[in-house]
């Protein structure tokens, strides 16, 4: 019984990884708008978090983070903003692309488990799906502002002149 359960989890993990890679390396996963892109790659992350729990969500989130980082250096597509951030600081670009996506998957697993204890699976899945896009956006943009908010590139995007700097409260 335990072997079957582990095999099922491994198959789901592989399937979600494959779907995510397909979406990341084809136009299915991103809708580019200016320097940013709306991503649909959070869908496999949410499904993995719902079906496999926090560890599965974090694993698929890590795959999403890696594909996002690889696009900064032109592997499997390109991200103009990612390339610019990579040229500013490669390590911070990795942190900004990888950590929010992995954290998103981890927290989605916990959110699903928390809501599932209090309601049915349908409502828990609905809440988790909403939180997926919301948390991805919040984590990604927060990391972007915290790590790169005072760079010339970011200041030029939001049209702030050189003497003015963003202050974190």
Residue ranges, per PLM feature:
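Central hydrophobic cores of alpha-helical transmembrane segments
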Residues: 59-68, 125-132
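Mid-bilayer segments of alpha-helical transmembrane spans in multi-pass integral membrane proteins
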Residues: 98, 102, 106, 133-142
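Interfacial aromatic-anchored transmembrane helix boundaries in multi-pass membrane proteins
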Residues: 24-37, 63-106, 110
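Juxtamembrane/transmembrane-helix interface segments of polytopic membrane transporters
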Residues: 72, 109-113, 137-152
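Single conserved hydrophobic/aromatic residue that forms the stacking wall/gate
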Residues: 158-169
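Internal alpha-helical transmembrane segments of multi-pass membrane proteins
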Residues: 114-138
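Residue-level signature of transmembrane alpha-helical entry/exit and packing/kink sites
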Residues: 5-16, 38, 42, 93, ...
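Hydrophobic transmembrane alpha-helices
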Residues: 1-63
């Amino acid at each position: 019984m335990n072997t079957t359960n582990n095999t099922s989890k491994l198959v789901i993990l592989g399937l979600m990884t494959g779907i995510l890679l397909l979406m990341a390396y084809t136009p299915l996963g991103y809708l580019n708008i200016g320097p940013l892109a709306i991503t649909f790659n959070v869908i496999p992350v949410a499904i993995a978090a719902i079906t496999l729990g926090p560890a599965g969500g974090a694993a698929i989130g890590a795959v999403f983070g890696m594909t996002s980082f690889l696009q900064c250096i032109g592997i499997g597509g390109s991200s103009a903003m990612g390339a610019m951030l990579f040229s500013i600081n490669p390590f911070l670009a990795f942190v900004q692309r990888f950590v929010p996506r992995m954290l998103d998957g981890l927290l989605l697993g916990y959110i699903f488990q928390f809501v599932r204890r209090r309601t049915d699976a349908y409502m828990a899945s609905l809440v988790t799906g909403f939180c997926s896009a919301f948390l991805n956006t919040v984590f990604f943009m927060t990391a972007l502002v915290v790590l790169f908010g005072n760079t010339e590139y970011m200041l030029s995007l939001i049209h702030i002149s050189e003497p003015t700097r963003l202050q974190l409260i």
